[in-house]
């Protein structure tokens, strides 16, 4: 079973607007986000990644590109990796939303919440888990490494799903822009190797890097 590298897209300027992005298209990486993406590509260039999947939203595709280029892989867009459908909340002011009566439910009991005209967290978690499980079935060799580039809440929801954590606790996890979370999935369960890591990723030193450094044994 594979090692999943769950990567959050790089920084963008939309966050400065103070609005909830949801599935908004047309959000591109800013200068810092581009540097984060390039750092990911450099850090993963010697890791034998078999495939790279990405949310089709621009901020994710642009983050995946340096990794794909370094590994000479084609990015596989996966619609089910899009961020949560927040319905009529998309593009709304977070400052205003935080003062709504339901905001405490979003933060403390998300399993009970559905975005107006959008998804529930239960539905979005199931969507992400289904997408990852399809990838796992396709890349089922023990040494396969798969990179998956998408969004913060989806990554936290996926980790919660595979580790059997209550959905209501997923907001306790951290997932910064340009970070990597490593999850090893086997028939007996899942192990969280790293959470919210920034380059370099020394724990991923694989055969290709060892060979470059002259450390392989005959």
State each model region's role.
Residues 1-2, 84-95, 137, 141-144, ...:
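Acidic, low-complexity terminal tails and accessory targeting/binding regions
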Residues 3-9, 148:
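Short, hydrophobic/glycine-enriched beta-strand segments
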Residues 8, 13-73, 77:
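Active-site-proximal alpha-helix that buttresses catalytic centers in soluble enzyme cores
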Residues 12, 154-155:
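Short active-site segment of divalent metal-dependent hydrolases/proteases
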Residues 14, 70-129, 184, 193-197, ...:
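Phosphate-handling substructures
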Residues 38-42, 125, 129-137, 159:
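Generic structural signal for well-ordered alpha-helical scaffold segments
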Residues 54-55, 126, 149-150:
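Short beta-strand scaffold positions
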Residues 66, 157, 161:
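Active-site signature of alpha/beta-hydrolase-fold catalytic machinery across serine-
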């Amino acid at each position: 079973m594979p090692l999943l590298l769950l990567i959050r897209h790089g920084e963008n300027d939309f966050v400065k607007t103070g609005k909830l992005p949801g599935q908004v298209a047309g959000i591109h990486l800013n200068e810092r986000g581009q540097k984060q993406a390039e750092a990911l590509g450099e850090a993963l260039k010697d890791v034998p990644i078999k495939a790279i999947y990405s949310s089709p939203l621009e901020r994710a595709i642009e983050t995946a590109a340096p990794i794909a280029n370094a590994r000479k892989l084609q990015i596989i867009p996966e619609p089910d990796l899009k961020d949560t459908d927040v319905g009529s909340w998309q593009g709304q002011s977070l400052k205003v939303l935080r003062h709504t009566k339901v905001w405490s439910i979003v933060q403390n009991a998300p399993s009970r919440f559905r975005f107006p005209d959008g998804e529930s967290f239960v539905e979005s978690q199931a969507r992400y888990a289904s997408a990852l499980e399809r990838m796992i079935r396709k890349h089922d060799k023990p040494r396969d490494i798969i990179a998956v580039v998408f969004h913060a809440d989806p990554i936290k929801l996926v980790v919660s799903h595979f580790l059997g954590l209550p959905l209501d606790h997923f907001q306790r996890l951290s997932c910064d822009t340009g970070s990597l979370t490593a999850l090893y999935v086997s028939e007996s369960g899942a192990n969280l190797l790293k959470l919210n890591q920034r380059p370099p990723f020394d724990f991923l030193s694989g055969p290709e890097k060892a060979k470059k450094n002259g450390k392989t044994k005959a």
